[in-house]
Every structure is written in C-alpha cells, then in structure tokens.
A protein has these predicted regions:
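Aromatic- and carboxylate-enriched substrate-binding clefts and catalytic-loop regions
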Residues: 61-207
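Carbohydrate-recognition beta-sandwich/jelly-roll modules
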Residues: 1-63, 160
Length: 207
C-alpha cells in the first residue's frame, strides 16, 4: 500500500543517515526551468516572483522562487556551465535582482552547476582526467573555488541554491547508465588516497 511504501522509504532514509539536517518549516515554491528551459530574464523572473507571491498570499512561510539555468555570463544553447561570479545582460546585477525578488515577497533561489566550467584561466591541474571542462573534486583548490562561488551566490542574497549535474559531471554518465560500473574508462582522480565516496562526501560538505 502507499502507506507501507512511505514507511519503507522513511526507514531506508534513516539507515542512510541517522542524524538528518531537518528543517522546522516546509520548503516549497517555484522553479522556472520547466517552462523557460534556460531562456529567461530578470523581467520574467520578477513576473514569476509576483505570480508566486499572489498564489501564496497570507502564508507566513514564504515560498522560494528558484531562477534556473540561463542567468550565467557564458550561457548559450550549447553550454550551461560557469563561471558563476556574474550574470549576463538579460539579468543584470544579480544582487539587485535578488533584492527585487525579495521585495515581491518571495525568497530568492538560484541554480548552478558547480563542476562544469570551461574558463580559460582555470589551472590544468584542477581539471578532471576524463573531461577537461569538469573540475576534479579531489583537488583542494577546486573545493575552495566552489566554496567561493557559493559565497558569491549567498552574498548576492540567494537563500536557496539548486546545485545540479554533480554526479553526472563526476562520473560521466547518469545513474540509469551505470549498470555494474559507476563510470567508463580507466581514469583516476588526482588524489589516489581517498575513495570516491570520501571525495563526494567532502564535496557536499563544502557545498
């Protein structure tokens, strides 16, 4: 029955983590991906924010409005990676946009893909052996770079971060493609002393 399935899922989650970071309030809201698909603007995001605020009028726990892919400076139809320190012309000042969203009575949220960045100034030692456009999470400087990206998003005023594609970028395939192997080929992380699980846990701790 549905109840038994739910309880089974709860039990499974408890086995995975016996000290979860639970919130006192419900996290809910909107995300513009499933109609914009990366083609939006500050004007449209503010319109989305106003609509969401109207739909949730009177609710003390305010909703998040998540701005998905498309805001970053190098966004194009064929690229959805970083850098993440500035928005493109359709979005303008990202801190000002967050403030305008908050003024609409929603909580600002933002999307980013932390491990994918083709910027020419990224050191070669930070790159994954398997794909030079992807960061190697075993490199300490990479984790600090990602931490700085996240600090920037927070300093702009975004309260929720949707970080995306991370396991795909690390392994080079989706979960349903893995089968008996997590990845393809014989590549390795720069740091050979830690397991993949240890590296991913540290990566998520940094985020």
């Amino acid at each position: 029955t549905p109840v038994e399935v739910f309880e089974a899922c709860r039990a499974f989650c408890s086995e995975m983590c016996d000290d979860p970071d639970c919130r006192d309030t419900v996290i809910y809201g909107g995300n513009n991906w499933y109609y914009a698909y990366g083609k939006s603007s500050a004007r449209e995001i503010l319109g989305d924010s106003a609509y969401l605020a109207e739909m949730t009028e009177g609710i003390e726990n305010r909703p998040f409005m998540v701005m998905d892919d498309g805001w970053q400076i190098d966004h194009s139809d064929s690229y959805n990676g970083g850098p993440w320190r500035v928005g493109n012309a359709d979005y303008g000042d990202m801190g000002e946009l967050a403030a305008q969203m908050r003024a609409k009575n929603v909580r600002p949220g933002i999307w980013f893909r932390p491990l994918y960045d083709h910027s020419a100034d990224i050191p070669a030692e930070w790159r994954l052996e398997r794909n030079a456009e992807v960061f190697d999470i075993s490199v300490p400087e990479v984790l600090e770079h990602i931490a700085q990206d996240i600090r920037q998003l927070g300093d702009w005023g975004y309260e929720l971060i949707k970080h995306d594609f991370s396991t795909y970028d690390i392994f080079g395939c989706w979960g349903f493609e893995m089968g008996t192997r997590l990845t393809n080929g014989s590549w390795r992380f720069h740091d050979h002393t830690k397991t993949t699980a240890e590296l991913i846990v540290r990566f998520y701790e940094v985020i």
